[in-house]
Amino acid sequence: MRKWNIGWGTISHCNMNCQFCYSKYRRKNSKDLGYADWVRFVDENHEKINSINYGTGENTLDESWFDLVAYIRNHYPEIRQALTTNGHLAEAVKDEKCLNAFIEGIDEVDVSLDFCDAQKHAEFRGQPEAYGWAIDTLALCEKYKKPTTIVFLGSEKNVSRENIDGLFSIAKEYGAILRMNMYRPTEGVNDLSKQFIISYETFVDALNYIAKQHHIISMNDALFSSFLTNETVADPSGDRSIRILADGSITPSTYLIDENYIVANITEPNVLDKIEKSNMLTNLIVKTIPSECKGCAYENSCAGGVYDRRYLWYGTLEKKDPYCPGVFHARNNQPIEITASDFVSVHDGYLPTIFFRPKED
């Protein structure tokens, strides 16, 4: 029986106005489900759920979300629960009931922090309290010994060596690891998204810099893992992971969220069983190696690259990853080393992302 890793935005509301938001349009007119629908879905499908990461919008704005966390922990303790928060968690748990649900029910926390500079982060997130909330939540997680990750956007605006050094210093101070999510143009490659799309050169330079100064502990990216580390990593999108939007829509990926990629809704009875037994996802996510990859040394390991990037840039899997620098005629003879680490994260194997650990003194 397949066990799914689920990313779930239970509500569409958010208290920030991020310049780069990948879900703003989708959340704008969302008809959100509520607690009864959430519980019904979990009750019917719990045997098929390995983990849940609660992401966009900001779940901590709704007390019912804390009730859901408590319900799942009490009834299905085998399901690992994680939260990605913009930092508002620290504000929400000033309520004792919410604090108890967090302490008892949440196994790990990702805190969004894109800049080590408070003013820059506040401007980037469109919220003057953004930096303070993030730091307060890091302190909260350290206090209650929750495994914590600083997650930062991989964009042309914030990926610099100076900012990387600052973020790693903050992570070290609070005993956290880090994770970089490459920016995705979910509403198309246009004048707005081009401001944030990170260049190949900037991205690879950042990875090489981090590998020398700190530790890369996991690289869940089919393209970059292949030619930077010589390791094969399968894209989990739609295979072991799915995304649930606030209106209950199910998609194969965090970033494939428009109508073209919706395959079902959690209000449908026994929906995870239905998805597994049908070809709903395999119609969208199927290993397709583009003809332009023929003869590449990484043709079978990379297999064309990351699914969501190919869809977002080109609308098809018949074209290779937009970050592919070209056909490799030989394998990398100086690969980046992935440092063995005992960390556990629901995001490791859930979506294409890269994890880091600050170097010890």
Residue positions per predicted region:
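Conserved short loop/turn motifs at secondary-structure junctions
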Residues: T56-E58, L153-K157, W313
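Short amphipathic alpha-helical segments and helix-helix/interface helices
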Residues: V42, F66-R73, C98-I103, I135-L138, ...
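Buried hydrophobic side chains on well-structured beta-strands
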Residues: I52-Y54, L83, V111, I150, ...
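Flexible mid-to-C-terminal extensions adjoining Fe-S/redox cofactors in radical SAM and related proteins
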Residues: I257-D361
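Exposed loop/turn and edge beta-strand positions of beta-sandwich/beta-sheet ligand-binding modules
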Residues: W4, G238, E292
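Radical SAM enzyme [4Fe-4S]-AdoMet core and its adjacent flexible, acidic
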Residues: K31, G105, S112-D114, Q119-T251, ...
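Conserved alpha-helical substructure of the radical SAM core
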Residues: M1-N100, E104-D107
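Cysteine-centered loop/knuckle micro-motif
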Residues: C18-C21, A234, V306
